[in-house]
């Protein structure tokens, strides 16, 4: 007879959202059980191998558990996070997994059980009471579906969606009018089985990567045709010569008969095996084309599921079953206000702002046959492209007609089109934190999730003692500012006053900023690199030269110091709003000194402090 465990909160799934939810619920005092399929926690950030997260990269958006995770990464990876060009934060996935494991160990009221998948949902009328696993059952006051594919939604017969919606349903401009070849071939976005390769160095001969049983190298022809081989490899470069292989252009995305993921166990395993072979085939192709100095990395992932430590424990899933919730996030809910940089705040029928998490990723869809045309939601900020900001409403986490359940992964109530922006790791981590906080509050107050006042949840997130989380996106307000909490509360209570610019009114004394502002992110030495780069003292963080303005929010610096790379021109980018403001208002072709970290893959300087003379500012009429 299987044992019965009881908890206040049960989290099923140890991915990005589930791990955050379990940690947050336990930190709030709820007796929490976390059941995961895999031996690593973190999902997309770790066990799926995508250790180069996208979105919420701006300093103002690095809050909550996402911000805490970045701080831990900076401390535990002393070589720095500036390795690849696809992300500002590239790290060894083993470090990410260790962070989550350590956080869980610190919580005596959080019981983590790994190696189990849900088998059945225990339900009474329209209320979820718990979940049955192979060897045990967990009964809980609140259950959270944090599985990668929304398994509890199917097992519990909770209303959900899978696949495309057409224009008539939500009025989304980017949705197709009717079924077509793309919607029928790829009902959801293609997953990717990430691999980690190793650059063993000039003259080295790595072990040969065997071709898998299913191998067709023609699928990868021209995969990096618009890039140099070095640019291709540097896309997901990690420390220690590691290379994350998650390439979207004729690479290792795999979507053939992707419906098998929600079919029988046999059909699901068939898809997973083919996806793994497809990724192995791509790494074989890379080695064949670029040489034997590149091979599969050793001892990265546990081998419980793939038998090869270079391949992630499971695919990077971009889409899941999606809840039919109280609120559904549509494309128009993530797009910026006309002429603005942010989406409207979600306001319910009672006029209450429902925002509980933030995101800013530009909508991005992956289909092996090519991309679709999507409404633009990108802006220039900090010398580069980023996404316009949006929020996740609390109602998207709550089933329309089922109690005792919250969702906190890619299974939230969102359209297929809008999922392309809400699915990213930092946003899902924010969603998980909000769901975990909501679950703990429901236990404390003896209520169902739909009965919890959203303003109570917002306040708890804003005032969390260990990882306070922003719920209103404000580009120019970082968490270290004294009036951060006041401004967050102001727009929660007065959502109609939320500025289309995403900037709240600030009074900034420029004299404090010029040459005196301290770095928000620690200066870290990068150590030795294994790609071809100029000689540069890694301890050197000061760069001087002539400032160039090449267009709107497009900056460069032709260096005069350090001498080892003098006369070279580097892009200037920043994640800091005060530095962004200084660069906007600095005159072109004037001398400029910045404190920055170099990214050799992207050929940019990530600026965290500016020293300049008042004469360098543009004069405003």
Which residue stretches match the model-derived regions?
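Flavin (FAD/FMN)-binding glycine-rich loop and adjacent Rossmann-like elements that form
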Residues: 44, 136-142, 146-519, 537-542, ...
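Short, low-complexity intrinsically disordered segments enriched in A/P/G/S/L with frequent Arg
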Residues: 521, 527, 533-534, 539
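Conserved beta-strand-loop-beta-strand element in the redox core of flavoprotein oxidoreductases
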Residues: 122-137
């Amino acid at each position: 007879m299987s044992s019965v465990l009881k908890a206040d909160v049960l989290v099923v799934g140890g991915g990005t959202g589930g791990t955050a939810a379990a940690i947050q619920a336990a930190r709030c005092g709820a007796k929490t059980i976390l059941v995961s399929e895999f031996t690593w926690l973190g999902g997309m950030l770790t066990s799926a191998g995508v250790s180069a997260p996208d979105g919420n990269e701006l300093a103002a958006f690095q809050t909550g558990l996402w911000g805490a995770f970045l701080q831990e990464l900076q401390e535990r990876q002393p070589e720095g996070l500036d390795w690849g060009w696809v992300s500002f934060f590239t790290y060894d996935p083993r470090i990410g997994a260790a962070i989550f494991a350590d956080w869980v160990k610190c919580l005596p009221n959080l019981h983590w059980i790994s190696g189990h998948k849900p088998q059945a949902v225990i339900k009474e009328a329209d209320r979820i009471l718990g979940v049955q696993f192979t060897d045990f059952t967990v009964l809980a006051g609140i259950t959270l579906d944090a599985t990668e594919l929304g398994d509890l939604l199917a097992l519990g017969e909770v209303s959900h969606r899978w696949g495309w919606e057409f224009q008539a349903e939500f009025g989304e401009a980017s949705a197709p009018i009717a079924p077509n070849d793309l919607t029928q071939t790829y009902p959801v976005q293609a997953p990717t089985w990430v691999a980690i390769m190793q650059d063993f160095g000039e003259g080295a001969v790595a072990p040969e990567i065997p071709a898998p049983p299913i191998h067709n190298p023609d699928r990868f022809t021209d995969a990096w045709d618009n890039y140099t081989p070095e640019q291709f490899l540097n896309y997901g470069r990690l420390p220690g010569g590691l290379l994350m292989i998650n390439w979207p252009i004729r690479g290792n995305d795999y979507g053939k008969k992707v419906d098998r993921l929600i079919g029988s166990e046999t059909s699901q395993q068939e898809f997973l095996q083919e996806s793994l072979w497809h990724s192995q085939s791509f790494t074989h192709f890379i080695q064949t084309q670029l040489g034997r100095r590149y091979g599969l990395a050793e001892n990265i992932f546990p081998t419980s599921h793939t038998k090869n430590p270079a391949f992630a424990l499971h695919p990077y899933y971009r889409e899941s079953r999606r809840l039919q919730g109280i609120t559904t996030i549509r494309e128009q809910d993530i797009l910026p206000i006309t002429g603005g940089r942010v989406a409207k705040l979600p306001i319910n029928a009672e006029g209450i702002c429902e925002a509980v998490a933030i995101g800013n990723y530009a909508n991005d869809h992956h289909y092996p046959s090519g991309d679709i045309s999507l409404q633009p939601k990108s802006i220039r900020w900090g010398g580069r492209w980023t996404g316009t900001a949006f929020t996740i409403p609390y109602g998207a986490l709550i089933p329309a007609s089922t109690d005792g359940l919250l969702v906190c992964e890619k299974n939230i109530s969102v359209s297929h089109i809008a999922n392309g922006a809400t699915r990213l790791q930092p946003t899902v981590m924010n969603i998980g934190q909000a769901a975990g906080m909501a679950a703990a509050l429901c236990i404390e107050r003896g209520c169902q999730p739909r009965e919890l006042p959203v303003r109570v949840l917002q306040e708890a997130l804003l005032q969390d003692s260990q990882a306070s989380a922003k719920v209103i996106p404000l580009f120019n307000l970082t968490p270290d500012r004294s009036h951060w909490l006041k401004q967050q509360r102001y727009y929660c209570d007065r959502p109609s006053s939320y500025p289309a610019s995403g900037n709240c009114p600030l009074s900034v004394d420029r004299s404090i900023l010029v040459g005196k502002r301290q770095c928000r992110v620690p200066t870290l030495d990068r150590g030795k690199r294994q790609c071809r780069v100029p000689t540069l003292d890694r301890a050197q963080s000061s760069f001087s030269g002539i400032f160039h303005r090449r267009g709107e929010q497009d900056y460069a610096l032709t260096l005069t110091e350090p001498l080892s790379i003098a006369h070279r021109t580097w892009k200037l980018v920043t994640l800091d709003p005060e530095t962004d403001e200084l660069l906007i208002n600095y005159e072109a072709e004037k001398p400029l000194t910045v404190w920055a970290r170099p990214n050799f893959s992207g050929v940019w300087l990530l600026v965290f402090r500016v020293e300049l003379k008042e004469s360098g500012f543009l004069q405003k009429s």
